Structures are given as structure tokens and as C-alpha cells.
A protein has these predicted regions:
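Substrate-binding/active-site clefts of carbohydrate-active enzymes
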Residues: 3-26, 33-37, 41-82, 86-221, ...
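Short catalytic-loop micro-motif centered on adjacent basic/acidic residues
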Residues: 98, 230-236
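Short strand->helix junction
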Residues: 14, 236-238
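Extended hydrophobic/aromatic segments used for targeting, binding, or gating
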Residues: 239-244
């Protein structure tokens, strides 16, 4: 293909009358006429802010606007059916679709757990500034609105390497979770802050083999369900090089 042209088909403050998926389906022919050969879509799954979420506060990767969760069925961009229709319309006009995906973290846990942690220096994440202690944190994800459809995997504190909120203490800090996979962080591409594994929310621990398997299963399901042509992986400098 000569001169392939990819358009970022979203922005942070999108608020037009048509939701984004409907707009994309309507504009597919026009985009092709302008020479666009690919579109980059925002995260299509449910974030912790439900229908208001931009998509980078990942809650449920399997909820593409299908289930009543986080106070909404659809996402900010529309329903699962509208998403699939937009992809189909773009494909009819020979336009590829890239899905934005956040594997780095999850947000909006459903249940509290008691978690062993150590505080770290926010400017140097390799420096512990406390001994081990226990907090209560929103680290259990059961996705009650989905009720096990597509995946019965339950995320708990063993799936995460760090968090930033202690519910019982009502305290915000960076807490390194102490689990069977290590007391600190994973090796990641970025050495900012000493080690930039932790970015925000519940930081996913790729040292856990069950986590790796679940994300691979999700990728297979997503390709089969949506027909997208590829992924743009968000926040890669914060993700384990071994997983990448």
C-alpha cells in the first residue's frame, strides 16, 4: 500500500450528538475518499467512570458496552453492537482498525481485600520508606454485571504489584504489594523514578502466570469478537519487558 494514512479518530473531550461508533460508521465512505487507510479507536471497554470514561481507567476488558456496570450499559462511545458495526463499515471501505488497549492497570475494584504492602518513595520507587503492614484496598474485581460471561477470572491482590489508595486509612500513597512474586517492582523499559513500573490505579503484575494467560485469552476473544486489525498498547514503558 502506498502512503498509508492513519487517523486518531477520537479526542479527550468528544461530545458530539452521535456517539463515536455511530459517527465512525456514518463517515466510513468519506474517510476512504480522503485517503484514510486506517483508524485508531479509543479503548472500547468499560472504565471505572462508566459512560463518562475516556477509557484509560480500565475496569472490565470484556465489557464493550454490553453490561450494566459502573452505572451504565454503554461506554462513552456507544454500545458493543455499535462498535462492531463501525468496524464492519470501515472494513467495507478497506480501512483497517487499531484498538487502543490498556494492560498496565485496572481501576474501580468491586471488593475490598486485606493486602500486605510497603510504602515507597514516590520520587524513587526502589526506596522503601516503611516496613510491611496491612491495609484494606479495592483489589478484587468480580464484575457482577457480567456474571462470568466470556471469562470467569477473578482479579485479586495477587494480580497486582502496587496500588495508590488505602481505604481503611483513607490515605493516598504508592504502596508496593508484597506477594509471592516479589516485594518490589518488575523490570520495565523506563527507569524514571528509579523504576517506573507503577503509574496509577492497581498496577498489573505480569509475574503472575494466571494474569498473563488471562490477558492472552482476552486478546484472542477480542480479535474474534470485534475483527479489529491490531492493537495500540498504552503505557508500554510501564509494562514488563518479558510480557511484551
Amino acid at each position: 500500500m502506498k502512503n498509508p494514512t492513519l487517523i486518531q479518530y477520537f479526542h479527550w473531550y468528544y461530545n458530539e450528538p452521535d456517539n463515536l461508533w455511530t459517527k465512525a460508521a456514518k463517515e466510513a465512505a468519506n474517510l476512504a475518499g480522503m485517503g484514510i487507510t486506517g483508524v485508531w479507536f479509543p479503548p472500547a471497554y468499560k472504565g471505572t467512570n462508566g459512560g463518562y470514561s475516556i477509557g484509560y481507567d480500565t475496569y472490565d476488558l470484556f465489557d464493550l458496552g454490553e453490561f450494566e456496570q459502573k452505572n451504565s450499559r454503554g461506554t462513552k462511545y456507544g454500545s458493543k453492537e455499535e462498535y462492531q458495526n463501525a468496524i464492519n463499515e470501515l472494513h467495507k471501505h478497506k480501512i483497517t482498525v487499531i484498538a487502543d488497549t490498556v494492560f498496565n492497570h485496572k481501576a474501580g475494584g468491586d471488593e475490598l481485600e486485606k493486602v500486605k504492602v510497603r510504602k515507597v518513595n514516590e520520587e524513587d520507587r526502589n526506596e522503601f520508606i516503611s516496613d510491611n503492614f496491612e491495609i484494606e484496598a479495592w483489589t478484587k474485581f468480580t464484575f457482577p454485571g457480567r456474571q462470568g460471561k466470556y471469562s470467569e477470572f477473578v482479579w485479586d491482590h495477587r494480580c497486582f504489584s502496587g496500588i495508590d489508595w488505602a481505604e481503611d486509612l483513607q490515605e493516598s500513597s504508592i504502596f508496593a504489594i508484597q506477594n509471592e512474586y516479589g516485594e518490589g517492582w518488575e523490570d520495565v523499559p523506563s527507569t524514571e523514578m528509579g523504576n517506573y513500573d507503577y503509574l496509577m490505579y492497581n498496577d498489573i503484575d505480569f509475574r503472575n502466570p494466571a494474569v498473563r494467560e488471562e490477558l492472552k485469552n482476552w486478546g484472542k476473544w477480542y480479535f474474534e469478537t470485534t475483527g479489529v486489525d491490531g492493537f495500540r498498547l498504552d503505557a508500554v514503558k510501564h509494562i514488563s519487558t518479558e510480557f511484551l
